Amino acid sequence: MLSLKNVSKRFGGIKAVERCSFEVEENTITSLIGPNGAGKTTVFNITSGLTRADSGTIKLSGNDITNRLPYKIAQAGISRTFQLTKIFKNLSIKDNLLIAKKTNYDEMKKMLESVYLHKPLDTIASELSYGQQRLLELARALLKPHSLLMLDEPTAGVNPKIRQELKTILRNLRKEGKTIFLIEHDMDFVMDISDEIIVMAEGKVIKRGKPSAVRKDRKVLEVYLGK
């Protein structure tokens, strides 16, 4: 589905990402984790078209999408949510959803129910809590035509209730055959829901495997947890 091969990026003299290679398999939840400064956000931005890679290739379903502009990435089939939400806070829930797709009342209500956002469609987005705004952004991303759903730090700033709801939402999407790529800092969260976990540190992939293998890996414990 998604393939990164030898992707590298420098900012001045700093190596943000160095020869990063991994794959996100179809119909899986794959999570990219690591400590602050590991390079996760840079990988997300490069894959989203927000930052240009210095070298390497990125492919989606076999098609080269390396260094395409963000709207071209979306057209290729990647739908995204961001750590800092990109919803329009001055617009209603309905209008935010209509930006993603011209749809009808029933489809919008069904989508909101699927992400546990039980609010009237005419509610202004600024009246929602931060966690509810994250859910609205997720609903909007799901409405867009896509083959890959990519989420940047979906648990950041949300309360325990929404955090648990996110687990259920992602599990349900997985059962529906969705392909999901998470960028996360919360190891416990991804351990519960991921088919595969990729661990980064200092710009490099240091471990890739099933949650049970990652949890026991000594290098991961040393680098990520400081043990």
Which stretches of residues belong to each language-model region?
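Glycine-rich phosphate-binding loops of nucleotide-dependent enzymes
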Residues: 1-3, 7-227
